Amino acid sequence: MSVKQINVFLENEPGRLAEVTSALSKAKIDIRAVYVTDSTSYGILRLIVNQPDDAKIVLQSMGFTVSISHVIAVALKDVPGTLDQVLEILSSNGIQLEYLYAFVGRASVDAVVLLRVDDREKTLEIFEKNGIKVLDDKEVYGI
């Protein structure tokens, strides 16, 4: 079970991020979560949207370099310590966390944490064994 994440390579220039959000807005694509990393000359924009395949097409048609990767979405109670529990489980099972970001949706009281790991299938098995609620793509896109 995974969620499609849009990855967009952006030059560090004024207005580049606004070009992306404007294009998605015009295409009626709703952004659910956003995460930006940057370096001196470029950034990587990571998006969870309600229509990932359409978003990729729209952005590529505008000349952006776009890829889709798969991340795991888990629902966590929005209380202190729940993220720590998940990270401890990953660590104790030898799973390398590449990055994560989180958001609180409007259709749930839980926080949603999106994780990119080195072994997605093993992580899903570990989460199931430990009672961690993994969300499917439709649940995340609908939040």
Annotated model-derived regions:
Residues 1-143:
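A conserved regulatory-domain signal marking ACT and ACT-like small-molecule sensing domains
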